[in-house]
Amino acid sequence: MATITDVARVAGVSKNTVSRYLNERGYMSEKTKSAIQDAIDLLHYQPNQIARSLTTKRTNFVGLVIPDVVQPFFATMASRIEDELDRRGYKMILCDTMHSPAKERKYLDMLTANKVDGIIVGSHSVDIDYSGIGLPIISLDRSLADDIPVVHADHVQGGHIAAEAFLKHGCKKVVQFVGYSKVLSPSAQRHKVFAEQMRDHGVECFTYELRLNQFEFSSYLQTAKMFLDQYPGVDGIFAADLVALAVQREALSRGRRIPDDLFVFGYDGSFVHKIAYPPLPTVIQPYEEMAATIVDLLERRIAGQTPEFHSYVIPVVSSESVPDEADGDPVGNYDLTVAPR
């Protein structure tokens, strides 16, 4: 296995010069940089990350804590965040808590013990003092503490978009499905706005709360069956994409026409709405913009800077306003300016 001494010998420079190159310290000519990199490539040299971290006080590892990697929203966000971290030279440690408070605590202890550079938290398992962890933290769609920045989609706008769709369709009796959560999440804003808009326009609106830790598609199908048995007169459903898909599938199996008899509108804009038939209209969350904002804020905190705002809110769009060629790439062709709040 090649050592730093071997690299220095092949490159014709000192060990100290190679060390400065690896740790990006001090001025160095492009010719010297090129010679060192050529030697590294030739020898397949791998720097000792432990020794390097002792010198730089950095590990270039970032932890991402999420409640369920199978859920389309979190799966998509994890992918986008990993891409963004990789582009900036970080490696991501994915921590899937499976909605377990005990696992969440264990993962946080592990990340802290391994001195990761920072943590991105999107888990909704337990309400603990994240401010006391002592590492740079950015929150994904969850209110953790006043001194921890949170990045989320504009759920108020999302609630309005969904409400307008139901009013336009002429629905008279609608139900929105709400996920159970022990902690405060900005995503709850969409449900509040949606219910207010429905009632302001004389539309009956009921809220159906999903059971704690109900996240499997099979359980959503069972819920859809029970729900349609209990509320046969409902003509509109508002839910996260995966839940909406389950309700739509069960309704179709009963001979309900979609959207004529039952108007189903989703929320998330993950791949789910594209595989649904009939097509599932939905509110598309800006995954790439959120990922870029989260990583940018985390880098600032790692550098010792204090972000200007506590909340960073990014606009959403309706799938019905997105051209087919942009479908599945929610923000690629849109100017979605980050709006601090």
Residue ranges with predicted function:
Residues 108, 116-122, 175-178, 231-242, ...:
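Periplasmic-binding protein-like
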Residues 1-59, 333, 337-341:
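N-terminal helix-turn-helix DNA-binding module of bacterial transcription factors
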Residues 67-76, 94-103, 151-161, 177-225, ...:
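Hinge/beta->alpha junction and helix N-cap segments in small-molecule ligand-binding domains
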Residues 225-226, 230-238, 242-341:
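Flexible loop/turn connectors
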Residues 17-20, 54-69, 173-180:
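Short beta-strand segments enriched in small/hydrophobic residues
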Residues 173, 205-207, 258-263:
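Short acidic capping loops at alpha-helix termini that bridge into adjacent secondary structure
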